[in-house]
Swiss-Prot record:
Residues 289-356 form the Mop domain. The complex is composed of two ATP-binding proteins (ModC), two transmembrane proteins (ModB) and a solute-binding protein (ModA). Keywords: ATP-binding, Cell inner membrane, Cell membrane, Membrane, Molybdenum, Nucleotide-binding, Translocase, Transport. Belongs to the ABC transporter superfamily. Molybdate importer (TC 3.A.1.8) family. InterPro entries: AAA+_ATPase (IPR003593), ABC_transporter-like_ATP-bd (IPR003439), ABC_transporter-like_CS (IPR017871), Mo/tungstate-bd_C_term_dom (IPR008995), ModC_ABC_ATP-bd (IPR011868), Molybdenum_import_ModC (IPR050334), Mop_domain (IPR004606), P-loop_NTPase (IPR027417). It is an enzyme of class 7 (translocase). It comes from Shewanella sp. (strain MR-4). This is Molybdenum import ATP-binding protein ModC. The gene is modC. One of its GO terms (cellular component) is plasma membrane. One of its GO terms (molecular function) is ATP binding. It is a peripheral membrane protein.
């Protein structure tokens, strides 16, 4: 485990985090601007020193107040910043091999292949696109043979086409490398595609931490997501494809099924499916003759009025999964919606795109 129990007073922020993070998969650190995300990873990497507490990575003590403070180069932690920070006078190959602990051709070839940078090795940073520079920066961090990788919003400085270019490489790294990654982001799109776990910060304090689906669907996330962006993550597996239409059927653990647009490639892995709360409607009886393909049976768990009172955020239990829906107070009153009531949730399959579906690692 990555054990964190630290405090640090910055000029406008007091950071205080006490938690344990798993040493496998990707842990996303999420929060608004100024929440302390970058400050936290700088403390983990040794770029900043806590005022008190301790940090340990597995059996290695990285920091303990007044007794231990390993410098960054001794922590065996790779760091990828928002900007690539490549050496302009070195070729791509020179940047990659800088700081390699062991000159092993096998590791070099594997990292270069995973990141798709074989054809860039003789080029210099000034000739690279933003996405290419970030791939090289990630490769350089991996070739130091780290025990953990810190990534501080590596896509933040890229435009949308470059983000789409780099994201598949990050997905491959997350799946192929047995290396814990702490990934800072304010983008829920990135977190959905990459993360297994999630830690939410607000004003320097941790307000939630745990498996991605659990945190994403939690009440603690609600205040930090705009009403129109509220969404749920459901777990499902590919069952089959429609024989006549470009649709794929997903099967949930509770027996409910989801039809999504497109013919997804076969996989035995569990999928994470994002459902926007604004795309969910509810009814108390099974509808007949509807164009909506997805009808999920569930029970109302909780109802939360929005801050402006114009909408109700409805939480629906679907076996072990939970689904959010935005409805009006009028609908709540007319349908007599209360906790424990059995209902049907309707979701249009065409509203779910490839960016709303990700494999669990």
């Amino acid at each position: 485990m990555l054990n964190i129990n630290i405090e640090k007073q910055f000029s406008q922020l007091q950071l205080k985090v006490n938690t344990q993070l798993p040493l496998q998969g990707v842990t996303a650190v999420f929060g608004r601007s100024g929440a302390g995300k970058t400050s936290l990873v700088n403390l983990l990497g040794g770029l900043t020193t806590p005022d008190k507490g301790e940090i340990s990575l597995g059996d290695t003590l990285l920091f303990k107040h007044k007794t231990v403070n390993l410098p960054p180069e001794k922590r065996r932690i790779g760091y990828v910043f928002q900007e690539a920070r490549l050496f302009p006078h070195y070729s791509v190959k020179g940047n990659l091999t800088y700081g390699m602990r062991h000159k092993t051709p096998e590791l070099f070839d594997k990292v270069v292949s995973l990141l798709g940078i074989e054809k860039l090795l003789s080029r210099y940073p000034s000739t690279l696109s933003g996405g290419e520079k970030q791939r090289v920066a990630i490769g350089r961090a991996l070739l130091t043979s780290p025990q953990m990788l810190l990534m501080d919003e590596p896509l933040a400085s890229l435009d949308l086409p470059r983000k789409r270019e780099l994201l598949p490489y990050l997905q491959t790294l997350a799946q192929e490398l047995k290396l814990p990654i702490v990934y800072v982001s304010h983008s829920l799109d990135e977190i959905l595609q990459l993360a297994d776990h999630m830690l939410v910060l607000h004003q320097g304090k941790m307000i939630s931490q745990g498996p991605l689906t659990q945190v994403w669907n939690s009440e603690q996330m609600r205040p930090w997501v705009p009403l129109q962006e509220l969404s749920s993550l459901l777990s499902a597996r590919i069952a089959d494809r429609h024989p006549d239409y470009p649709m794929t059927r997903l099967l949930m653990d509770d027996g409910n099924q989801l039809w999504v647009s497109g013919q997804l490639p076969p996989t035995h892995k569990q999928l994470k499916v994002r459902i926007q709360a604004n795309h969910v409607s509810v009814c108390t009886e099974e509808p007949k003759g509807s164009s909506i393909r997805n009808l999920l049976r569930g029970k109302i768990k909780e109802l939360y009025p929005s801050d402006n009172g114009e909408q109700i955020q409805l939480k629906i239990a679907l076996g072990k999964d939970e689904l959010w829906a935005n409805i009006t107070p009028w609908a709540r009153d007319e349908l007599q919606l209360i906790p424990g009531k059995a209902i049907y949730a309707q979701i249009k399959g065409v509203t779910m795109t490839q960016m709303d579906i990700a494999e669990s690692h």
